[in-house]
Amino acid sequence: MSFNDKNFMLKNEPAKELYVKIAELPIYDFHCHLDPKEIFEDKVYEDIVDLWLGGDHYKWRLMRANGISEEEITGFASKLDKFKAWARTLERAFGNPLYHWSHLELRQVFGIEELLTEENAERLYHQLNTYLQEHQISPRKLIADARVAFIGTTDHPLDNLEWHKRLAEDSPIDTVVAPTFRPDEAFIEHRNFNLFIKRLEEVTEVAVRDFASFVEALGQRVSYFAQHGCRASDISFTAITYEEATLEELNDILLARMVGKEVGQSGINKWQTAIFRELCRMYKKHGFVTQVHFGALRNNHTGLFEKLGADVGVDSIGDQTCLTGNLNRLLDNLVKENALPKMIWYNLNPGYNIALANTLANFQANEEGRRSQLQFGAGWWFNDTKLGMIDQMNAYAEQGMLANFVGMLTDSRSFLSYQRHDYFRRILATYVGQWIVDEEVPEDYDRLGQFVEAISYYNAKEFFEQ
């Protein structure tokens, strides 16, 4: 067996048998950051750097660690020089998931089985660009070739969803492309909060003067998304907080923030608690799956943030106090208010895996027969690795029902990232296969085949469509 062959990452014989059952399943990519405009316009890529390196802060972060100049990462260096800089980095990136992902992409998308190195970088650069043109590689072709059944984009709550509408009306591909409601700017600590209120008023024609009118305007946007095929929401919190407030306090917090005053951490916590609760009420009404990402400390390198903006590879894993206390109180309150929607929770700090999975298990009871209505999401961001995936599945299996897990998502800005689903499926097959080897489960390939098939595709489809 050699690196990156057909049995790549399949570490035992049962894994090979299980992988065959899931290798060709469709992909249900329920959370990503792809641009629906790019999907609709479907332009053929002219340069591999635009497709492979553009906007990919995972690669940028690794290149900086390898001493590559910013000019060759995000600057004005030629595309060939940027490609060579990436090759110099990748050839030394043993142990990093990018080494695996990148070579899977080269083999599975472009048919290139040799390893990318500094020595062959220029030749492969031209070979890849020729392939793009000869095979007319475009977003829709990549989506179709990867057998993607569903794409959930991530969208600003004030987006008019023009490109989603056009895709729904006039798209030659079978893939459903649905918006996801992402209202980060509705939370009072966001730097664009006041600008968001101004634009919210313009779009909804609701004058925001107090908490109730703000919620009314937000509700109008949630309904708009629901009318245009939205199946999910998403939010990113630095930490999970819970602090009750009176309506008068919430009005005071809003008015203070609107005139530029500081509201303090307590004000931030009270607003987060209240607005998220109201949003969850709306999400349940419309049947949205509510996704929560938490634990990221963002934009830590001030110089790069000011020069390049957000999402450029300078973010960290955070920590917090009272996670389980706050989360239990929050979920309990949502249950009491009959405002608990289906949810997927993603934590960035793996030290909280067991605590999160354990807490979610407290609130699975429902009369609708929903299986694991509160999901512990796949290893996110810095945990999107072999060990990260295994740690997440261990915690889920030990504290809940891994059989109900909705599985993998790309969470990516790249149309080449669908190979991450294959990577996950290989790791899943080995993970379950090892149970067979260790005699921890019966050697029942029919039943275990259904188990891995559900996690790879069918659970997600059911969770988002029923």
From Swiss-Prot:
Pathway(s) annotated for this protein in UniProt: Carbohydrate metabolism; pentose and glucuronate interconversion
The protein's Enzyme Commission number: 5.3.1.12
GO process terms (BP): D-galacturonate catabolic process; D-glucuronate catabolic process
Pfam family, one: UxaC
Catalytic activity, reaction form: D-glucuronate = D-fructuronate; aldehydo-D-galacturonate = keto-D-tagaturonate
Key words, A-Z: Isomerase
GO molecular function terms attached to this record: glucuronate isomerase activity
Keyword Secreted: no
UniProt xrefs under HAMAP family: UxaC (MF_00675)
Family: Belongs to the metallo-dependent hydrolases superfamily. Uronate isomerase family.
Protein's name according to its UniProt entry: Uronate isomerase
Organism: Streptococcus pneumoniae (strain 70585)
Gene, per the UniProt record: uxaC
